Design a protein with these regions (language model features):
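Conserved structural motif at the start of ABC-family nucleotide-binding domains
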Residues: 3, 18-20
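Conserved hydrophobic segment flanking the Walker A/P-loop of ABC-type ATPase nucleotide-binding domains
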Residues: 25-27, 338
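The feature captures the beta-strand-to-loop junction immediately N-terminal to the Walker
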Residues: 34-36
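Helix-to-loop junction immediately C-terminal to a conserved catalytic motif
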Residues: 49
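Conserved coupling/switch loops of ABC nucleotide-binding domains, chiefly the family-specific signature
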Residues: 53-58, 208
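Conserved ABC transporter NBD signature motif
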Residues: 57-65
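ABC ATPase nucleotide-binding domains
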Residues: 74-77, 81, 85-226
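Non-catalytic connector elements of ABC transporters
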Residues: 249-364
């Protein structure tokens, strides 16, 4: 069983929401659509569900063209970021509602509702009403209603965004495990790179309605095809700094030079973009060949147990991500260290030409 998007495009009033998308989703797979707000994630899922019709292209399900099929004729479920439950009926009846619409036998309804409730750990809540539930319990109820009908295609439109961090982690792990056992196609939209990594499976990077890259999550993360993909799949976005490679060294500015390592010596002389993840910039060298840079603090932000420090000099700006709480005043000078063995390299056209080698300890 598979769903293929073939040259799919969709737009309204001259605004393109999906541009020439070509993707295939397989049964038993968990697929993540990762992109910023307005990148086309929701529009793409609405096309898959049959809620909107494409301007161009086709949707192929199991070899059959289903582009014009109504949403009612498709076996699809969609879960939104809002907790959409019917407040006037119990959790049991909320979950049972799509089965009653399908005129299923009462005994089968009861079996499916109780089985799905147990799977999502809400069995004790079946007699309660949605407004008496916590946010996490309400979202579990909405998920149960979507899953109880055994849809062949299950779409998640940022379903955990309104939950607190701990609940999100918990439900994320449950979803990942749940779909390992189900022979349906799951598609999950998110704006967060860390969520895509946690969910695993296949990741599709979207930008302004277009597919930038698609593949197994760690392949996309470790080998982004260009600078845009690298920045989309990094939280905060990967830092990009301009550098020039000569026969003997790489220079980032008049003060920051580094002798070519064995790996970087394979680059032909010229101008490149060098990418470094914010979490890989350090306040002390981890290796003898780490590149030292003199910077100035532009902004320091503490978020939970992490500190994000925006730093710059006359040539470039970067963000560094540090574990723990660190206090830095705006304008304070700071020396930072970039691990040469963890640099991504992109050519002047911003295409990937070098990834950090796992053999050299640069796996990212």
């Amino acid at each position: 069983m598979s769903l293929t998007l073939e040259n799919l495009s969709y737009g309204v009033d001259g605004v393109d929401y999906v541009r020439n998308a070509n993707l295939t989703f397989q049964a038993g797979s968990f697929n993540v659509l990762l992109g910023r707000t307005l990148s086309g994630k929701t529009s793409m899922m609405r096309l898959m569900a049959g809620l909107d019709k494409p301007n161009e292209g086709r949707l192929i399900f199991n070899g059959q063209d289903v582009t014009g099929l109504s949403v009612q004729a498709r076996n699809v479920s969609m879960i939104y970021q809002q907790f959409i439950n019917y407040p006037g009926i119990t959790v049991y009846e909320n979950i049972a509602s799509p089965l009653r619409l399908a005129k299923m036998a009462e005994s089968e309804i009861d079996r499916r509702v109780k089985e799905t409730a147990a799977m999502l750990q809400i069995s004790p809540l079946l007699k309660r009403y949605p407004l008496a539930l916590s946010g996490g319990q309400q979202q579990r109820t909405a998920m149960a209603r979507a899953l109880v009908k055994d849809a062949t295609l299950v779409l998640f439109d940022e379903p955990l965004v309104n939950l607190d961090y701990k609940l999100r982690e918990e439900l994320r792990a449950e979803l990942r495990d749940l779909f390992r056992e189900r022979q349906c196609i799951a598609v999950y939209a998110t704006t967060e790179a860390n969520e895509a990594l946690a969910l695993g499976g296949t990741t599709t990077l979207l930008h302004e309605g277009g597919v930038i890259q698609n593949g197994p999550v760690m392949d996309v993360y470790r080998a982004p095809v260009n600078t845009l993909a690298a920045q989309l799949f990094s939280e905060p976005p990967m830092n990009m700094i301009r550098g020039r490679v000569t026969d003997t060294e790489v220079a980032f500015d008049e003060y920051s030079h580094h002798a070519l390592t064995q790996e970087l010596s394979k680059l032909t002389p010229g101008d490149y973009w060098f990418g470094v993840r914010p979490s890989h910039i350090a306040l002390a060298p981890a290796n003898d060949d780490d590149l030292e840079m003199s910077m100035e603090v532009a902004l320091s932000e503490i978020s939970g147990s992490e500190t994000f420090i925006h730093i710059d000099n006359s040539h470039f700006e970067m963000v560094m991500q540090l574990m723990g709480v660190h206090q830095y005043h705006t304008g304070a000078p700071v020396k930072v260290y970039l691990p040469i063995n963890k640099l991504f390299v992109f050519d002047s056209a911003e295409k990937l030409v070098h990834t950090p080698s796992r053999k050299s300890g640069g796996a990212v």
